[in-house]
Amino acid sequence: MQARQRRRAMEARMRIAMLSNREREVLDRLTQGCSNKVIARDLDISPRTVEIHRGNMMEKLGARHAAEAVRLQLEASLVDWLH
């Protein structure tokens, strides 16, 4: 079971590595439960720009919902924990 989890975590990390820095910042804040409005304020960008980054991020990750993107982020963080 742990080998399978490690593989999934590595796959998630590889997918997240394809994101731009700004897309990763948006994903980090989504993972923290922030709304687009809060993300926009924190990053000093417009809510529309957050939507664009979020859409690009989800397309690159192959995520249909924000929850899938957050799950990938959490799985990617398991790599260090599983070693």
Predicted region positions:
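Residues within the DNA-recognition helix of helix-turn-helix
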Residues: 42, 53-56
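Helix-turn-helix DNA-binding segment
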Residues: 10-49
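Basic, Lys/Arg-enriched C-terminal extension of HTH/homeodomain DNA-binding domains
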Residues: 55-83
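Short, flexible helix-to-coil linker/hinge segments that flank and couple to helix-turn-helix
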Residues: 1-18, 25, 75-80
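Short, hydrophobic secondary-structure boundary micro-motifs
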Residues: 4, 39-42, 82-83
